[in-house]
């Protein structure tokens, strides 16, 4: 049994598909495709899959990943890509299918590109000058202070007409002591 990573992009109206709905979409697409995927055992067997770093509702993406176990010994990755793209809903395109090189929970960094009105550029640039940005992180049980600069060291701005775009390379997993 091999674990396969399906990379896909989500654009336009597909960006409003939530994680739970995306799981349903992938389950249905994989069933319709007839590809040899592994199902869990038990009373309610379903396709076992793991999403790496899912985005919030309304966010477009150029690369999201889902890991799926296959029953095939040597899967034809190009066939998987073609079969999945043939039945994907509008706005979702499979860009790559490949064997997993690292587990989804080991992916530690993500790059986000965000657009803001150009009038806000000055405020965004002030972030880079700050030495410390303490942020309160709330959970169900408690609240703790996290240093944001450790996870988002700097913002890189580019002007795009009336808007300014900035890229964030951020640490996703915050290690707990």
What are these regions (language model features)?
Residues 172-177:
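Residue-level detector of conserved catalytic or cofactor/ligand-binding positions
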